[in-house]
């Protein structure tokens, strides 16, 4: 998906995004890219994985979000909420590069100004969050997750879980004014 813009409020259950609800590849030989796209309105999920650009990236190959902007607030009544992407689980390389999120982010847990939750447990996995900015006012987590009881909210990546893969957060900034949590 390249050079597109949405100017509508988006509502949905799981995997809700301003440009793509679900982004990914079924095999290692394929690549998915969202590039030079803008989402101008709010994105609201009533389930898991809500993002200003992509709700979820689940990929066996490589997936990229490049040079995108999300202007609206991003919220969900459940988990994994991000200003750009709600949820990343990858067996290949996944990158968020050169993106800006301007809206407030709110969810139950794993809430981040750029990415809500990123998991990189496969040896071939690489997750890069680079050259990106969260310029919203507020990130809020209203509950906790069942596995460890933590609320997990931050201006960049709410929960970054790395096993045998590699993850990098490089040259990013958060201009968040308030991070609110309820719980641990």
Give each language-model segment a name:
Residues 1-184:
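Predominantly extracellular beta-rich ligand-binding scaffolds that present long acidic/polar faces
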């Amino acid at each position: 998906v390249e050079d597109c813009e949405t100017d509508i409020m988006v509502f949905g259950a799981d995997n809700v995004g301003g440009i793509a609800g679900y982004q990914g590849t079924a095999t290692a030989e394929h690549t998915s890219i969202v590039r030079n796209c803008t989402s101008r309105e709010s994105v609201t999920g009533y389930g898991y994985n809500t993002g200003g650009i992509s709700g979820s990236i689940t990929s066996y190959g490589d997936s990229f979000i490049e040079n995108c902007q999300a202007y609206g607030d991003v919220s969900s009544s459940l988990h994994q909420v991000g200003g750009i992407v709600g949820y990343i689980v990858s067996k290949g390389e996944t990158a968020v590069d050169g993106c800006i999120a301007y809206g407030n982010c709110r969810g139950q847990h794993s809430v981040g100004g750029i990415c809500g939750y990123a998991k990189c447990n496969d040896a071939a996995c690489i997750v890069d969050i680079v050259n990106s900015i969260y310029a919203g006012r507020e990130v809020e987590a209203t509950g906790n997750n069942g596995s460890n009881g933590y609320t997990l909210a931050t201006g960049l990546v709410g929960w970054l879980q790395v096993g045998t893969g590699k993850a990098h957060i490089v040259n990013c900034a958060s201009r968040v004014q308030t991070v609110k949590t309820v719980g641990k």
